[in-house]
Amino acid sequence: MIYTMKKVHALWVSICLMLNLAPAPLNADSEEDEEYTIITDTELPPLKLMHSFCAFKPDDGPCKAIMKRFFFNIFTRQCEEFIYGGCGGNQNRFESMEECKKVCTRDNVHRIIQTALQQEKPDFCFLEEDPGICRGYITRYFYNNQSKQCERFKYGGCLGNMNNFETLEECKNTCEDGLNGFQVDNYGTQLNAVNNSQTPQSTKVPSFFEFHGPSWCLAPADRGLCRANENRFYYNSVIGKCRPFKYSGCGGNENNFTSKRECLRACKKGFIQRISKGGLIKTKRKRKKQRVKIAYEEVFVKNM
């Protein structure tokens, strides 16, 4: 009798277990299908970065400090926090979320367009063409700093740099000589009393400077991470001159020189001056009345 009751009890337990487990595969399949559908239906616009280094993975460096920093994540398309060791690493590292967004997010482009001076070319116009890492075959335009013209190239479809325009007109308005598209909304004009024509007001940086040096000379001055206060020089590509700054003693970038002469030797190569009338381009030549320029030109030619 006891054996029969145990057998019946075991049978009912088996039936209950079968009923509870039977729907599980169906639910699992439906959940997988639902999750798959969500993934495939999600489409994001092509990612176009302002700088290629914004695509670098976060690098905490070889040191062991614990410092809160931010990097741009190309997968989430957002600036995120990571722990930095205090030395080394790469350029995709920012001290604040705001700085990260300002440098790497596309939303900041409109702000740059509205505030850039009319006679200045943006720094990214001097960057070389960069097709990116993808394998697309998209026609785009870039500004060639050697030919001084906008030219066509094939873009892979992702990453690259900001010297990348969808139309030839957009490229010309932004980077070629003359009045480019980077205008301040309230930018005024003044009437020329001689020819009764409107001419732009003078800007803080003359438009007749052209830069042809190494690409890393375009980097801004970087004080670094330590607490020293060393006198160094960096090349300011906007005005074409080497300027002093205070270096902390570690970190920073390659645009960092112990002397002004060393800075000029590295970054002044190919620096030319364009005559404003007629748009002609020529290098500086020796003139008897300009002894200072002669001495400078001798050094310049020697280091070519």
Curated annotation (Swiss-Prot):
Residues 54-104, 125-175, 217-267 form the BPTI/Kunitz inhibitor domain. Gene3D superfamilies: Pancreatic trypsin inhibitor Kunitz domain. Glycans are attached at N145, N195, N256. The keyword Kinase does not apply. InterPro entries: Kunitz_BPTI, Kunitz_BPTI_sf, Prtase_inh_Kunz-CS, TFPI-like, TFPI/VKTCI-like. GO terms for molecular function: serine-type endopeptidase inhibitor activity. Disulfide bonds join C54-C104, C63-C87, C79-C100, C125-C175, C134-C158, C150-C171, C217-C267, C226-C250, C242-C263. The record marks K64, A65, R135, G136, R227, A228 as: Reactive bond. Coiled coil: none annotated. Inhibits factor X (X(a)) directly and, in a Xa-dependent way, inhibits VIIa/tissue factor activity, presumably by forming a quaternary Xa/LACI/VIIa/TF complex. It possesses an antithrombotic action and also the ability to associate with lipoproteins in plasma. This inhibitor contains three inhibitory domains. The first domain interacts with VIIa and TF, the second one with Xa. This is Tissue factor pathway inhibitor. It comes from Macaca mulatta (Rhesus macaque). The gene is TFPI.
